[in-house]
């Protein structure tokens, strides 16, 4: 809860600073001089409310959505030795990480992957793919589980949701400024908001949202290094490196993780060139090198 309060306070400060900065640079006067009557303070508050509402709502239903989108079966009563081992391992790792035991599940996928999600570190879900259980050693799976437990213990799901809330706020804010400017200045519409406003706003939201996702993905990549460190601490550096090397050997396999969960999986796929800016995970080679330097 303290993390949420501090982050919300920080984001409120960002909104206020943005409002003051725009006023100091005479942006209000510029818009008024061009016939655009827009209260930027009210617009910022409006965008912040809706920007954070969408992000936090997604966070609160993340466990339910993850189970539905991946067909994850939560283990309540273990039926096999794999399931028994999974429960015991997650319980041990959770205890060592200082969090409550999350729900544990298996999702039907040939690819080697795992994810963690949940709105609270003491009310989370950790799931692993059937393919990973079949092809990875117990030490490697334990390292992957430790990585996911690291995400939970670090509060990464909450942090990323709040970062997305900030991004949503400013995408909505600047898209509406652009929409008003196009409508009033370029199309000279003086009576209410015309079609140009709505078209320009939607177009700007799509473009700005795409560009701003690079910011969210940058935060996501930073989280992965921290989760790898947690995995190494809980399961051993050698096991964590071995798990990442095994993942690297299977990079040719398609990743079928839903887009909404890609940032929370251990395997984010491969991208080249400028597309690397929009990767949720650093390249596996970089993650392995970071662990080796850590020792």
Swiss-Prot record:
Organism, as annotated: Pseudomonas fluorescens (strain SBW25)
A GO term, aspect molecular function: metalloendopeptidase activity
UniProt cofactor note: Binds 1 zinc ion per subunit.
Family listed: Belongs to the peptidase M48B family.
InterPro entries in UniProt: HtpX_protease, Pept_M48_protease_HtpX, Peptidase_M48
Pfam families the record matches: Peptidase_M48 (PF01435)
Keyword terms, alphabetized: Cell inner membrane, Cell membrane, Hydrolase, Membrane, Metal-binding, Metalloprotease, Protease, Stress response, Transmembrane, Transmembrane helix, Zinc
Protein name: Protease HtpX
Lineage of source species: Bacteria, Pseudomonadati, Pseudomonadota, Gammaproteobacteria, Pseudomonadales
């Amino acid at each position: 809860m303290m993390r949420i309060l501090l982050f919300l306070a920080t984001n409120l400060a960002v909104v206020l600073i943005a409002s003051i900065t725009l006023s100091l640079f005479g942006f209000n006067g510029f818009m008024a001089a061009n016939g655009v009557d827009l209260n930027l303070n009210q617009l910022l508050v409006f965008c912040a409310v809706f920007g954070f509402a969408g992000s936090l709502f997604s966070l609160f239903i993340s466990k339910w959505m993850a189970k539905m989108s991946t067909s994850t079966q939560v283990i309540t009563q273990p039926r096999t030795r794999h399931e028994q081992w999974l429960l015991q391992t997650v319980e041990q790792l959770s205890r060592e990480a200082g969090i409550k035991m999350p729900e544990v599940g298996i999702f039907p996928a040939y690819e080697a992957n795992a994810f963690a999600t949940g709105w609270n570190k003491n009310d989370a879900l950790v799931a692993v793919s059937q393919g990973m259980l079949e092809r990875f050693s117990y030490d490697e799976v334990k390292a992957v589980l430790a990585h996911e437990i690291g995400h939970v213990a670090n509060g990464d799901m909450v942090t990323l949701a709040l970062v997305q809330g900030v991004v949503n706020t400013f995408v909505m804010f600047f898209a509406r400024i652009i929409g008003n400017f196009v409508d009033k200045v370029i199309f000279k519409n003086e009576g209410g908001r015309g079609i140009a406003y709505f078209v320009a706003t939607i177009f700007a939201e799509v473009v700005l949202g795409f560009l701003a996702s690079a910011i969210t993905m940058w935060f996501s990549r930073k989280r992965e290094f921290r989760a790898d460190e947690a995995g190494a601490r809980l399961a051993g550096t050698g096991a964590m490196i071995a798990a990442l090397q095994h993942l690297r050997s299977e990079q040719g396999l398609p990743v079928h993780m839903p887009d909404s969960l890609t940032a929370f999986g251990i395997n984010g796929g491969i991208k080249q060139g400028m597309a690397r800016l929009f990767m949720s995970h650093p390249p596996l080679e970089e993650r392995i090198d970071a662990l080796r330097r850590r020792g």
